[in-house]
Amino acid sequence: MGAVAEEVCAQLRERGARPYVIPFGGSSALAARGYVESGDQIRMQLPDVEHVVVALGSGGTMAGLIGALGEDRVLGVDCGAVAEPADVVAALSSELTGRDVTTASLRIRLDQVGPGYGVLHEPVMEAMNATARAEGVVLDPTYSGRAMAGLMAAVRDGDIRPNQRTVFLHTGGLPGLFGHTQTVRRSVAALDSVTFG
């Protein structure tokens, strides 16, 4: 796909156009700038935030947050979308910030991929149901559900301690709900126990 896209871009440039190829997952240093702004908003509203937990797909969201908050505050939960997530995030973050962001400096949980990208497994189902019951929030099983499972695991293993100011960034995922209708039905059924008020 990359070679074909470059060929088409070259043809368009010859005609005076200014094409831009949107990479897999939409992640590029340019796209990550949107999440720099998101991170700036988090920092302005919660200056003492210690952890921002986010799903790590193609890397742009995490890289943008790192651009605003630094590596020490951002915890990415790998969803299995790319083969070497730390390499991808380090490269995007380095390009975005203009400094050398190393893979060793990143906080990435690799324990929620389970059997593979988009394949539902028990910790994600538990996180989805617990979040629906406790907060009335439905999570998708591919991204936000895995991120919440990673947040819960980080609390269990002490990476995130009680009373530390933590933000969970729900990045959407509506299309991911349609491939897992039974799981979503269970999460929605859990909403019956939620009291809104």
Language-model regions, residue ranges each:
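Small/polar-residue-rich loop-to-helix segments that shape phosphate-bearing ligand pockets
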Residues: 1-46, 107-126
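Predominant activation on well-ordered alpha-helical scaffold segments within soluble catalytic domains
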Residues: 6, 10, 36-43, 63-66, ...
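Generic secondary-structure signature for well-ordered alpha-helical cores
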Residues: 10-18, 40, 44-48, 67-71, ...
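Structural motif
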Residues: 20, 51, 165-167
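Active-site flanking residues adjacent to catalytic metal/cofactor-binding acidic residues
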Residues: 22, 77, 139
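Glycine-rich phosphate/pyrophosphate-binding loop at beta-loop-alpha junctions
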Residues: 29-115, 169-197
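Active-site-adjacent helical/loop segments in soluble small-molecule enzymes
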Residues: 104, 109-163
